[in-house]
A protein has these predicted regions:
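Alpha/beta enzyme core
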Residues: 1-264
């Protein structure tokens, strides 16, 4: 059983020593399950972060995602969102904002996880939802972006859908804690979404994801049980079976007679 949550310094000290685990969760229940399972890093959207979230995952390193262009745009908005996350119990924030914003957050003591490779919010610049870094020129751009984040003061970076040899070489040549999303095991942490791990993703499942449970089938089974229970209730009411005598409150015959006399 873990007794203390890791710090930024702890993650940096473990760079190159082991593979950390990182999961993006969609609910407090998932956060608690991830924490109980021993997940090292839990990422969550800023709208879900709260003191309750921190309580259910006391020993995980929590990264709060500040969604670019939605939760924040300007540097001041990022600073406010970053401090709000830390005050709720987060350990760091994820940001795809510009380098100036990341540098400013670092200056104010907000630990930042950046993003390189395929960045969904900026996918039009790299050709859409597809791998990045498959040519030497493209790989060099990923490397430059990583070094720029390092220079700006980020302590870690998600590297998404980049060829494993490229991601591995980048990880070995940067001080950043490199978090692999579909970029192989040569980085410092592996990152997946809970929806893919748990099998609740009903849309496109990316090639790099791996399913470990089928909660969507279980959800469908439970939903059918709900329908059946509600239908049985409807039938019971309409047939006169509910409520039966055992579920009623009684009244003394004389008291009932007195009541009826009073209202008639």
């Amino acid at each position: 059983m873990r007794s203390a949550k890791p710090t930024v310094a702890d993650l940096q000290a473990q760079k190159g020593q082991c593979q950390l685990t990182n999961v993006y969760v969609d609910s407090i229940d998932e956060a608690q399950a991830a924490s109980d399972a021993g997940i090292d890093i839990i990422t969550v959207q800023d709208t879900l972060m709260s003191s309750q979230f921190r309580r259910v995952a006391p020993y995980a390193f929590i990264v709060v995602g500040i969604e670019y262009g939605i939760s924040a745009v300007t540097t001041d908005e990022y600073l406010r969102a970053g401090f709000a996350a830390l005050n709720s119990g987060a350990d760091a924030v994820w940001s795809a904002a510009g380098l100036g914003t990341i540098s400013r957050m670092r200056d104010e003591g907000i630990p930042v996880v950046g993003h390189v490779g395929l960045i969904p919010a900026r996918r039009t610049w790299t050709g859409g939802f597809k791998a990045v870094g498959r040519s030497a020129a493209s790989a060099i751009e990923v490397w430059k972006a990583t070094k720029a984040l390092e220079d700006a003061g980020a302590f870690a970076a998600e590297i998404e859908v980049v060829p494993e040899p490229v991601a591995s070489a980048i990880s070995k040549n940067t001080s950043l804690v490199m978090i692999s999303m579909g970029s192989g095991s040569g980085c410092d942490a592996q990152y997946l979404f809970s929806t893919d791990i748990l099998g609740t993703n009903t849309g496109h499942v990316p090639r790099h994801a791996k399913q470990y449970a089928d909660l969507e089938a279980e959800r469908a089974r439970i939903q059918q049980l709900r329908v059946e229970a509600f239908a049985a209730y409807v039938d019971d009411v309409r047939s006169g079976g509910f409520p039966d005598e055992s579920r009623l409150v009684s009244i003394d015959d004389q008291e009932l007679s007195d009541f009826r006399s009073a209202i008639n």
